[in-house]
UniProtKB/Swiss-Prot annotation:
Oligomeric and partner information: Monomer.
UniProt cross-references to SMART domains, sorted A to Z: Arg_tRNA_synt_N, DALR_1
InterPro entries: aa-tRNA-synth_I_CS, Arg-tRNA-ligase, Arg-tRNA-synth_N, Arg-tRNA-synth_N_sf, ArgRS_core, DALR_anticod-bd, Rossmann-like_a/b/a_fold, tRNAsynth_Ia_anticodon-bd
Motif 'HIGH' region location, chain numbering: 130-140
Reactions accelerated catalytically: tRNA(Arg) + L-arginine + ATP = L-arginyl-tRNA(Arg) + AMP + diphosphate
Protein name: Arginine--tRNA ligase
Main location: cytoplasm
EC number: 6.1.1.19
Length: 553
């Protein structure tokens, strides 16, 4: 019995108990919480459901807990129930209930942990969206790893996810980038407000290879040539580096298209017509304070040009017009102000502000030999995606970027994540999978066939470490669901570390294959089934993170 199944049993039992006493059943929450107690002597799981609803139902918590304990005792999968403290319920599962967890894992295989929480929900997930003026920096790299993992996690809960990259090919930064390319092509220093680094010279040379007479063209034509070829080359490099990192997008949306198509102008006119814009100080302002923003925002400047938010408004309208139920934006730490302004923009169009979610991520720092790594040799100013991958590889880079909450700044110790030891979290998890794969190969080499889980006597798995491992496997579906609901894929990484720890402790305490034995006992078969279930869940979890599950290391 998984925690999810136990929670459902508790809820149904609570409904029956209250209904049988003519008490209000509406006080029972839609989802009942069950947790593993810190002290194993308190049982396999605990819940505070009686304390949570007793007051609303008009009864004493311990009385309700006692009624629930009586009703649960003897039900399938329940070994014992006891009331503790002010009204906690401590539950022990029957041996067969633990075996049921293994059967669920091995019957579902790759599908174990998947659910239908967001079945049918169309999600637009926009992440990275770095300016096309340089390589993907470490902040963008963090979003690449986390965003891709979040997309996989939402899909595991039934969502239809479109991964989108917003290509900022409009605005002043493009002009500075182009002027930097032209200066490099001439052998001159970068403009004061331009971009430096070896990559600028490399792209400038590629522009000249594609268009040898580019520098001889009239100024406007020269600028457009360097813009067209240079921005295209930079964007191709960004896409290539992300692809090599295991991240691909379904849509690359060009900001410039919002202006050339008239989408920005149309959005502004609609807001004028609805009365949500007003004219003051020579500019047009969005009445965003009416929708919870801390100040009104300029959409059309006094010189007649559009402010950046005008493009954001049009872009949000475009997403919603494409049929997305939920638009998630993953932005850097300097974008906190986008949360109220995007929600205000939605409300101004009589749209649902809750259809917009903004996730804010903090910075990433690299540390080597105990000191910060400051400079990229090629970018000249900032560390790139490739710098991290070159140092530690794709798997270690992705896992290290995902395993911590994006709410906090992240320091990545390059020395630590390069180690082949249990100190290195990604090695620790991958090694557990490789060890489990090796165990199954060794069994096969001895002629031992674990057979079907339906034929195994799983009631033999009575050791404390076996129980710990089984219960940890049972937690996985709930972890995936909460990671999707909270938009926190790092929960999956931390769970995998707990699972690897539970497996290593089991392996040290419980011999699976006896040296020299080629005859499998029923206990051997049961333990091989447990090991295969653990391997399967590790593989499933690593897959959601976009990290490989090696069969040998």
């Amino acid at each position: 019995m998984t925690p999810a199944a136990l929670a459902e049993l508790l809820r149904n039992t609570a409904v029956d108990v209250l209904a049988s006493r003519d008490l209000d059943t509406s006080v029972i929450p839609a989802a009942v919480t069950v947790e593993r107690p810190r002290n194993p002597e308190h049982g396999d799981y605990a819940t505070n459901i009686a304390m949570q609803v007793a007051k609303k139902a008009g009864v004493a918590p311990r009385d309700l807990a006692g009624w629930l304990a009586e009703a649960l005792t003897g039900q399938d999968g329940i070994d014992s129930v006891e009331v503790a403290g002010p009204g906690f319920l401590n539950l022990r599962l029957a041996a067969d209930a633990q075996g049921q967890i293994l059967r669920e894992v091995l019957d579902a295989t790759d599908a174990y942990g998947r659910g239908a929480k967001y079945q049918g929900l169309k999600v637009n997930l926009e992440f990275v969206s770095a300016n096309p003026t340089g390589p993907v920096h470490l902040g963008g790299t963090r979003w690449a790893a986390v965003g891709d993992a979040l997309g996989r996690t939402l899909e595991a809960q039934g969502a239809e996810v479109t991964r989108e990259y917003y290509f900022n090919d409009a605005g002043a930064q493009i002009d500075r980038f182009v002027r930097s390319l032209i200066a490099a092509a001439r052998g001159e220093a970068a403009p004061e407000d331009g971009y430096g680094g070896a990559y600028i010279g490399e792209i400038a040379n590629q522009v000249l290879e594609a268009e040898p007479t580019a520098l001889d063209l009239p100024e406007a034509e020269r600028h457009e040539t360097f813009r067209r070829i240079g921005v295209g080359l930079m964007f191709d490099e960004v896409k290539r580096s992300l692809h090599d990192f295991g991240v691909d997008f379904d849509v690359y949306f060009h900001e410039d298209s919002l202006h050339t198509s008239g989408a920005v102008e149309k959005s502004v006119e609609q807001l004028k017509e609805s009365g949500h814009l007003y004219f003051a100080d020579g500019a047009w302002w969005l009445r965003s304070t009416e929708f919870g923003d801390d100040k009104d925002r300029v959409l059309i400047k006094s010189d007649g040009t559009t402010a950046y938010i005008a493009g954001d408004v049009a872009y949000l309208r475009d997403k919603r017009n494409r049929g997305f139920d939920l638009c998630i934006y993953m932005l850097g730490a300097d974008h906190h102000g986008y949360i109220p302004r995007l929600k205000a923009a939605a409300a101004a169009f009589d749209d649902d502000p809750d259809a917009v979610e903004v996730l804010i991520g903090q910075m990433v720092n690299l540390v080597k030999d105990g000191k910060p790594v400051r400079m990229s040799k090629r970018a000249g100013t900032v560390l790139r995606l490739e710098d991290l991958v070159d140092a530690v590889g794709v798997d270690a880079a992705r896992y290290s970027l995902i395993r911590s909450s994006v709410d906090s700044a992240l320091d990545i110790d390059l020395d630590l994540i390069s180690k082949r030891s249990n100190e290195n979290p990604v090695f620790y998890v991958q090694y557990a999978h490789a060890r489990l794969s090796s165990l199954q190969r060794n069994a096969a080499s001895l002629g031992i066939d674990r057979g079907s889980v339906a034929d195994a006597d799983l009631s033999l798995l009575t050791h404390e470490r076996e129980g710990d491992l089984i219960r940890t496997l049972g937690e996985y579906p709930r972890v995936v669901r909460s990671a999707a609901e909270l938009r926190e894929p790092h929960r999956i990484a931390r769970y995998l570390e707990d699972l690897a720890s539970a497996y290593h402790k089991f392996y040290d305490a419980c011999r699976v294959l006896q040296p020299g034995d080629d005859q499998a006992t029923p206990l051997t078969i049961a333990r091989l089934q447990l090991c295969e279930a653990a391997r399967q869940v590790l593989a499933n979890g690593l897959g959601l993170l976009g990290v490989s599950a090696p069969e040998q290391m």
